[in-house]
Swiss-Prot record:
This is GDSL esterase/lipase At5g03820. GO terms for molecular function: lipase activity. CDD domains: SGNH_plant_lipase_like. Pfam families: Lipase_GDSL (PF00657). It comes from the Eukaryota. Belongs to the 'GDSL' lipolytic enzyme family. The keyword Cell membrane does not apply. SUPFAM superfamilies: SGNH hydrolase (SSF52266). PANTHER family: GDSL ESTERASE/LIPASE EXL3, ZINC FINGER PROTEIN. Keywords: Glycoprotein, Hydrolase, Lipid degradation, Lipid metabolism, Secreted, Signal. One of its GO terms (cellular component) is extracellular region. Its main location: secreted.
Length: 354
């Protein structure tokens, strides 16, 4: 019965998709992306930060084999999402030279690797804070309004899907390695602390005219190769770190509850919480059944901790075929895994495109 429901929902999405494609128009007027390295398409390239991915072997399986700044060997889940929605190009990184003129009319990408709900996370790594991403979005709105006028611009903003994917850096690159935060907050208390900036962010987006917002849950933090290496049991690199996964589950529960309250209090808002925890956990725990060979080690280098500048052309041991791997580097999914995640997002996101 469960499989039948999934198939029925998938068929509905496909039917809806082809209906939109048949008109030559995407299903929504624009796609706005905000968050961290999981969805950063190159904004960090222009920052003075170590958290970058604009060099080989990143991007080796992307279009023209270019390292665009995406933290993967190829496409991000949001790239697949843009394709499925009927867009013929991906949202341009807002800090890039391409972010001008009519290129902005179908959306933009404001995400920055190492950003988080807590602005302190981004500040520590010299990334773009979520508050600054929102300021950049306001600037973007002014540019679009100048191009097409207020009436059409407002329709673009209200009809656009706004995707937010962040939070992992708050835990993996801040809380777990910061003794001060560890001493002040339990993981549960830290999750509570992050709900306020999340609520404020959604409220601010809503005030700017956004009516379709999607936010991703945390992934199974304890199954990321770098997390297993850094926080797992000594000598045991084959098991997810359960306490980290439990922290993610707790956070995700709070995220769902907070999102429900926001939906109830903001008239006309469609807010969808995208579950990426379970699809990625399924791939990590059952790689072969999902078409993968390896889920404990990443493709890049030794597959244990390498990410960003540690994952480079000189990294010894990088795999030859990333499609066999769930993870490209120590923190980020491969293109093949991103495709699976995107397929799940499409089914879950029906309320945002209907």
């Amino acid at each position: 019965m469960k499989m039948f429901i999934i198939m029925l929902m998938t068929f509905s999405v496909i039917a809806c998709f082809y209906a939109g494609v048949g008109t030559g128009e995407p299903l929504v007027p624009a796609l706005i992306i905000m968050g961290d390295s999981v969805v950063d398409a190159g904004n960090n390239n222009r920052l003075n930060t170590l958290i970058k991915a604009n060099f080989p072997p990143y991007g080796r399986d992307f279009l023209a084999h270019n390292a665009t700044g995406r933290f993967s060997n190829g496409k991000l889940a949001t790239d697949f999402t843009a394709e499925s929605l009927g867009f013929t190009s991906y949202p341009v990184p807002y800090l890039s030279q391409e972010a001008n003129g009519t290129n902005l009319l179908t959306g933009a990408n404001f995400a920055s690797g190492a950003s988080g709900y807590d602005d302190g996370t981004a500040i520590f790594y010299n990334a773009i804070t979520l508050n600054q991403q929102l300021k950049n979005y306001k600037e973007y709105q002014n540019k679009v309004t100048n191009i097409v006028g207020s009436e059409r611009a407002n329709k673009i903003f209200s009809g656009a899907i706004h995707l937010l994917s962040t939070g992992s850096s708050d835990f993996l690159q801040s809380y777990y390695i910061n003794p001060i935060l560890n001493r002040i907050f339990t993981p549960d208390q830290y999750s509570d602390r992050l709900m306020k900036p999340y609520s404020t962010f959604v409220q601010n987006l809503y005030d700017l005219g956004a009516r379709k917002i999607g936010v991703t849950t945390l992934p199974p933090l304890g199954c990321l190769p770098a997390a297993i290496t850094l926080f797992g049991e000594t000598g045991n690199n084959n098991t997810c770190v359960e306490r980290l996964n439990q922290d993610a589950v707790s956070f995700n529960t709070k995220l769902n509850n907070t999102s429900m309250n926001l939906t109830n209090n903001l008239p006309g808002l469609k807010l969808v919480v995208f579950d990426i925890y379970n699809p990625l956990l399924n791939m990590a725990m059952n790689p072969v059944e999902n078409g993968f060979f390896e889920s404990r080690r990443a493709c890049c280098g030794t597959g244990t901790v390498e990410t960003s500048f540690l994952c480079n052309a000189r990294s010894v041991g990088t795999c030859s075929n990333a499609t066999n791997y769930v993870f490209w580097d120590g923190f980020h999914p491969s293109e093949a895994a991103n495709r699976v995640i995107a397929n799940n997002l499409l089914v879950q996101g029906i309320p945002l495109i209907s």
